[in-house]
Amino acid sequence: TVQTAASPDGKDIVTLNEYDSFGRPYSVYRPVPTQTSSGAYASFASINPELLKFYNWEVYTFSKTLYEDSPLDRPVEKYGPGSLWHTRGKSVRTEYLVNEATGVLSCGLYLVSSDTSLTRSGVFPSGSLSVVKTTDEDGDVTLSFTDRLGRKVLERRLDGDIRLDTHYVYDDLGLTRYVLTPEASAAMSSDGTFGDSSAPVAGLSYVYKYDGKGRCSSKRLPGRSPVIYKYDKGDEPVFSQDGRMRERGEWMFSFRDALGREAVSGIWPSSRTPDTDGATVIATYTGTASLGGYSVNVQTPAIGVPLSVNYYDGHSFLENLRLSDTDRLALSPDTLSAYGVPVTGSNRLKGLHTGSAVRSVTDPESVTVSAFYYDRRGRQIQSHHLEALSGRRHVHQSLTFTGKPLRTRETVELPDGRADSLVTSRLYDSQERLVSETSSLNGKSQTVAYSYDGIGRLTGRSYSSGDGSHSLSESLTYDIRDQLTGLSSNVFSMSLRRQEPVLGATPRYNGNISEWEWSRGAGS
């Protein structure tokens, strides 16, 4: 693979791939910058010297995959790049097995005996489950048990002689009913029936229930009260209730418009169970209804308290909200040409999220109203916010061709008349890597410059103030697997060690950190 002129200095980045005689991926080399920028084919003979030079004469600059001797072409061993892994036999090994009646390959058989109980009935018969055993570079073992329908029924992790089992239990329709955590699996390792109120199920397990249409009607997390869901005729979840809401006699509602967009959500203060299964609930914007300007085709939520309202397809909602002329003007678009010109007219705004109103849960009188404006490509370039406590906030941004923020201006107008303005300008290279970022707060600026190595890894950051009164530079280093190994500056430095610790820790080859050493200034 050749990425034409993709390196920071405009050179090609090449990744070599080798295949075995059966056409299977065998070796994948690390990317490397070349001396050309034409995008032409590069052979191994021409790239290998560049690999050695770029990766500090590392010989094993590739990952390697070995396959079993069968038509299934299943991988059995994989080495990542790096001589420490290849020469020390630190690979990821995969074995394909079947379950057994006893030992580490046995799997408990859990059945859903009723809507409110779970039964453990011995173990799965030998040979009825396929088992994939994965051993990582540090010898950590994971066993994944799958039934004949392709469903995972057990994931077992081994910590020495200790088994950490996560069981997945399905009903006759194939729906997930229970997920047993390792603690729950250990507590239910003997045969028996366990009700939903039993300690292992209620306190340590995930429990799911479904209605007659296969929709999740109740979900309970370990140690939590169940969350109940109610659906409409279109299978949309329109009401939900957790344990605290049941105590207060409340439901959370969420209604969508005819296009499936979330329109209004909030609290319905009622202890009775809503019945919406017979109708498709649709929120329609009228501008005068009590639910933030929306009306719905069911009666139950008419007295609901909206907490979040979303508006689409235009800005007519600003005329219908109870806003003063000053506030309405604050939410209108600006004409700052440096940040693009927002489009107007409902035909240009079809399908776009143009505004919102969010009410505080603790203070129902506190409402934040926002209006969003877009350019002719449908990209947001302005947002204006009327915030109950902090005043007004205006955000303008210009974008690159691909939509990355190029220049952003955020102004906050405080209730006491003060105003703060933060302007951020960004520069990108040809591959849209961030090269510099300059932020100016009320005229005082600071710049952060970023540098990259030949394959695009961040290798340096430099901070400087606009008046030159202070500056700071830091560098970052990586290993051959792109894992961060160090960060250094004149005020803080750190080293992350994995496979080659120097302070007596156990070497780690699977990516985990074995040692972290840091220093601040002259100390450590």
Walk through the language-model features, giving the residues of each.
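Beta-strand elements of repeat-based all-beta scaffolds
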Residues: T1-S524
